[in-house]
């Protein structure tokens, strides 16, 4: 998000933080995800609610009339805050509701360590899916119903991960919102990391890193980015040696395979 949407999102999250202590956060997260699904489906409603020329009071009144008997008061407050705000694009409005849903879902994991646990579970599930094409196909095929996919996720993860992780994986699988499964899992992971006040570095290495190597890398990246760094490490033998590090959209490629590819590009040029 940029400009006015970024400012509005900051205010929505600030007001959400005031609501969370007295709310049933699991219910709040679930209901907000349902609102996301509604807004994604109802294009005209989404555009009308995001229209900067519209009256905030009128938007809030419409939301109240649509949702008052269907969701909790806490959910109604959050959605009302979102529709009263100004957004650059209709998509930004829905993304704000989705981010509020994610934060409500992980609200019981208050400490940075607990939030890192959710990140790790999302990352590990993403690696499992990437390594099992048949499982990925079962989770992403258009031919399977949402209920079938939801049941599959529950059978795979129930009792093995936190309730928050199970909820977020289920959302990424059943309502991808135009993202691939991997993109959805990474998006939720980034939102959790932002909540924990740190960045995620996805590190690809040919062999496992020792604890000492991980600590040194973490410290070096923290100095570079000026923020705590959480490492997600992928073992990728085909890179031969060295490391590839991705933080957000920035990639540091120090792999041998990367250097060979660069030499080949130069020779070809």
Swiss-Prot record:
<dbReference type="Pfam" id="PF00213">
    <property type="entry name" value="OSCP"/>
</dbReference>
<protein>
    <recommendedName>
        <fullName>ATP synthase subunit delta</fullName>
    </recommendedName>
</protein>
<dbReference type="InterPro" id="IPR000711">
    <property type="entry name" value="ATPase_OSCP/dsu"/>
</dbReference>
<dbReference type="GO" id="GO:0045259">
    <property type="term" value="C:proton-transporting ATP synthase complex"/>
</dbReference>
<comment type="subunit">
    <text>F-type ATPases have 2 components, F(1) - the catalytic core - and F(0) - the membrane proton channel. F(1) has five subunits: alpha(3), beta(3), gamma(1), delta(1), epsilon(1). F(0) has three main subunits: a(1), b(2) and c(10-14). The alpha and beta chains form an alternating ring which encloses part of the gamma chain. F(1) is attached to F(0) by a central stalk formed by the gamma and epsilon chains, while a peripheral stalk is formed by the delta and b chains.</text>
</comment>
<keyword id="KW-1003">Cell membrane</keyword>
<comment type="function">
    <text>This protein is part of the stalk that links CF(0) to CF(1). It either transmits conformational changes from CF(0) to CF(1) or is implicated in proton conduction.</text>
</comment>
<keyword id="KW-0813">Transport</keyword>
<keyword id="KW-0066">ATP synthesis</keyword>
<comment type="function">
    <text>F(1)F(0) ATP synthase produces ATP from ADP in the presence of a proton or sodium gradient. F-type ATPases consist of two structural domains, F(1) containing the extramembraneous catalytic core and F(0) containing the membrane proton channel, linked together by a central stalk and a peripheral stalk. During catalysis, ATP synthesis in the catalytic domain of F(1) is coupled via a rotary mechanism of the central stalk subunits to proton translocation.</text>
</comment>
<comment type="similarity">
    <text>Belongs to the ATPase delta chain family.</text>
</comment>
<dbReference type="GO" id="GO:0046933">
    <property type="term" value="F:proton-transporting ATP synthase activity, rotational mechanism"/>
</dbReference>
<dbReference type="GO" id="GO:0005886">
    <property type="term" value="C:plasma membrane"/>
</dbReference>
<keyword id="KW-0139">CF(1)</keyword>
<keyword id="KW-0375">Hydrogen ion transport</keyword>
<keyword id="KW-0406">Ion transport</keyword>
<keyword id="KW-0472">Membrane</keyword>
